[in-house]
């Protein structure tokens, strides 16, 4: 596994889905771009999911990543909100999968642990460490910063023996 690998990290959300593209060569990381795909909260659910789909598809076409990582969603007390978030996450997984990318999933605490060293941290800690790890990173809010963290997490985990075995097992 040598050479440059371009990774897209995605932090799914129905209102705002964060995305970030980084490159990894060995242990070094390079920031490519980050941002947020927004859906119109006045539109119906199907239209909002289409907006997320089209926005992510455009990002993939523009940046041509080779691997994708999506943050797993959590279940909260509002079942309807959790279901909608799950649908947005489905779009976040579908778009790169349809583009032929392998899609890895990471729990929020795994992302935090990879970036700040502990599984339970605050948003400001993630922002601070993203800036330390990638000083040239520019992001327009929490969602894009979280997506950078997801991409960094994947860059670290993709070098693990378990990830290599998973890649070898797939055609």
From Swiss-Prot:
This enzyme catalyses: Endonucleolytic cleavage at a junction such as a reciprocal single-stranded crossover between two homologous DNA duplexes (Holliday junction)
Q: List the disulfide bonds.
A: none
List the catalytic residues.
11, 71, 143
Q: Which UniProt keywords apply?
A: Cytoplasm, DNA damage, DNA recombination, DNA repair, DNA-binding, Endonuclease, Hydrolase, Magnesium, Metal-binding, Nuclease
Binding annotation for Mg(2+) 1: 11, 143
Q: What is its main location?
A: cytoplasm
Q: Name one GO cellular component term.
A: cytoplasm
Question: Cross-referenced PROSITE patterns, in alphabetical order?
Answer: RUVC
Q: What does this protein do?
A: The RuvA-RuvB-RuvC complex processes Holliday junction (HJ) DNA during genetic recombination and DNA repair. Endonuclease that resolves HJ intermediates. Cleaves cruciform DNA by making single-stranded nicks across the HJ at symmetrical positions within the homologous arms, yielding a 5'-phosphate and a 3'-hydroxyl group; requires a central core of homology in the junction. The consensus cleavage sequence is 5'-(A/T)TT(C/G)-3'. Cleavage occurs on the 3'-side of the TT dinucleotide at the point of strand exchange.
Q: What's the subunit arrangement here? A: Homodimer which binds Holliday junction (HJ) DNA. The HJ becomes 2-fold symmetrical on binding to RuvC with unstacked arms; it has a different conformation from HJ DNA in complex with RuvA. In the full resolvosome a probable DNA-RuvA(4)-RuvB(12)-RuvC(2) complex forms which resolves the HJ.
Q: Which family does it belong to?
A: Belongs to the RuvC family.
This chain belongs to which protein, by name?
Answer: Crossover junction endodeoxyribonuclease RuvC
> Which organism is the protein's source?
Chelativorans sp. (strain BNC1)
């Amino acid at each position: 596994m040598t050479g440059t690998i371009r990774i897209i990290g995605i932090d799914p959300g129905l209102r705002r889905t964060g995305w970030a593209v980084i490159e990894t060569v060995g242990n070094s990381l390079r920031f490519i771009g980050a941002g947020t795909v927004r859906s119109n909260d006045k539109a119906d659910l199907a239209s909002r999911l289409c907006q997320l789909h089209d926005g992510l598809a455009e990002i993939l076409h523009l940046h041509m990543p080779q691997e994708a990582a999506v943050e797993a969603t959590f279940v909260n007390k509002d079942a309807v909100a959790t279901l909608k978030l799950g649908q947005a996450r489905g779009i976040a997984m579908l778009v790169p999968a349809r583009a032929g990318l392998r899609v890895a999933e990471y729990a929020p605490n795994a992302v935090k642990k990879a970036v700040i060293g502990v599984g339970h941290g605050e948003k400001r800690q993630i922002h601070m460490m993203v800036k330390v790890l990638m000083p040239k990173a520019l992001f327009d809010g929490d969602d894009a910063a979280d997506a950078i963290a997801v991409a960094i997490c994947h860059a670290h985990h993709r070098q693990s023996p378990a990830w290599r075995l998973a890649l070898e097992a797939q055609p």
